[in-house]
Every structure is written in structure tokens, then in C-alpha cells.
A protein has these predicted regions:
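Small-polar-interrupted transmembrane alpha-helices in polytopic inner-membrane proteins
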Residues: 97-114, 164-170
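Membrane-proximal helix-loop-helix units in multi-pass membrane proteins
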Residues: 103-143
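Terminal transmembrane helical module of multi-pass membrane proteins
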Residues: 142-215
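N-terminal signal-anchor transmembrane alpha helix
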Residues: 3-32
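Extracytosolic (periplasmic/ER-lumenal) interhelical loops and adjacent juxtamembrane/interface segments
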Residues: 33-64
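Individual transmembrane alpha-helix segments
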Residues: 52-88
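Cytoplasmic juxtamembrane regions at transmembrane-helix boundaries
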Residues: 78-107
Length: 215
């Protein structure tokens, strides 16, 4: 397997791993049951039980928090490896470089969130959230500016839509605005677009590599 395909595989694995951890760890909750509408993703990694968050108090008790934090660390590693291994395939220029670096910063956010659960070090965890929320979504918007790239250049529309969706999710989540899916649901709208984007990019890297080999 060449470098590009290995990097694409890392990106294609990161999203199902993270989503599976969200589902499985959430199903382990008993008192209270986990709610995607009410609870934050971070609540799955909290190491203590009790009422959490003074701005939006909610009961939290995650028996499998170690599994969630381990999955976040693995997601961070896969996202970072995806960036580094597919670096040449994503194109040249300031926009392509900026998109790579911003995505790498988001990967660092996942690593920091895993190392500093919200109830252990709230300040560091908030910094991790900002790296994911702000820089991750900004990276997709910057990627929408990439022109001459068989990978990013061919998905400018998807980058723009997903980046804009993520930014809207961030603003609504931070403003604690519920548009029908709960404030916790809005956090998913802020976080999941980047994960979907990496799947799309990974798939395009694989197709671009196959096209090169056949030409």
C-alpha cells in the first residue's frame, strides 16, 4: 500500500471509530441514560459522576469513559496521519497548505480532549474544543478555495457546504440555541462535518491514485 492510500485509509477509519465509540459508550450509561440531544460528546469522557456544567447543568455518569477517551486519542492519531501521509496528494498552494494545517490542529484538539477530560481540566478541554470547532471547520472553508488539485479541487462545493454547516453548528451550540435537536445535537452539527469531510477526501485520494495507476 502506497503512502497516499495508507493516509486515505487512516481518514476512512477515523470517522467510523469515533462514531462507534459515541454509540457504544453512550449505551453503557444507566443513571442517567445518555441523550444525544441533551449531553455533550465530552460527557462520554468524563471520569466522575454527578451534575456537570454550571451553564447547562445535566447529570453525567459514563462507566466506559476510558474507552471514549481512548477512542478520541485514536481518532486524533488517525486524523493526523491522514493529513501527513496524504500531504502531497492534496495539492499545492496557500489554500491547500492552510487546509492541511487547520485539519492537523483539529486532530490535536481530539488528542488534547482525550488527555484532559472536561471534569479533569476544564480549561484545557475547552481549548481542545476550540481547536476542533473553530479550526476544523475553518479548514474546510479554506479547502473550498483550493483550485488545482485532483482531490480538493474536485470537492470545493462539499467543502463549502460542510464547513458552513459546521460553523453554523458552532455558533448555535455556543449560543445554546435549540433548533429541535437539543443543544447536544447542535454540538454534533458542529463536530461531525469535519469527520464526514475526511471520509470524502479519503475516498477521493483513493480514486485519484487508482486513476493515476490506470493512466
Amino acid at each position: 500500500m502506497d503512502r497516499d492510500r495508507l493516509g486515505a485509509a487512516c481518514w476512512l477509519l477515523a470517522t467510523p471509530l469515533f462514531l462507534a465509540a459515541n454509540v457504544v459508550v453512550g449505551l453503557a450509561w444507566r443513571q442517567p441514560p445518555f441523550s444525544w440531544a441533551t449531553h455533550n460528546i465530552s460527557d462520554l469522557g468524563n471520569v466522575t459522576c454527578g451534575v456537570w456544567d454550571s451553564t447547562r447543568p445535566r447529570p453525567v455518569c459514563s462507566p466506559w469513559h476510558d474507552a471514549m477517551n481512548g477512542a478520541m486519542a485514536a481518532t486524533a492519531a488517525l486524523l493526523a496521519l491522514g493529513v501527513l501521509l496524504t500531504w502531497p496528494a492534496l495539492g499545492r498552494g496557500l489554500a491547500a497548505t492552510g487546509a492541511r494545517l487547520l485539519t492537523l490542529a483539529a486532530a490535536a484538539g481530539y488528542a488534547l480532549a482525550a488527555a484532559a477530560p472536561a471534569d479533569v481540566d476544564e480549561n484545557r478541554h475547552f481549548l481542545a474544543a476550540l481547536l476542533i470547532f473553530v479550526l476544523g471547520n475553518l479548514g474546510m472553508l479554506v479547502a473550498a478555495l483550493v483550485g488545482r488539485s485532483p482531490v480538493l479541487g474536485g470537492m470545493r462545493g462539499a467543502s463549502l457546504v460542510l464547513g458552513s454547516t459546521g460553523v453554523a453548528g458552532v455558533l448555535l451550540f455556543l449560543g445554546q440555541v435549540d433548533v429541535g435537536v437539543g443543544v447536544g445535537g447542535m454540538e454534533r452539527v458542529a463536530v461531525f462535518p469535519l469527520l464526514l469531510w475526511t471520509v470524502l477526501v479519503g475516498a477521493r485520494v483513493v480514486r485519484a491514485g487508482r486513476a493515476r495507476r490506470l493512466s
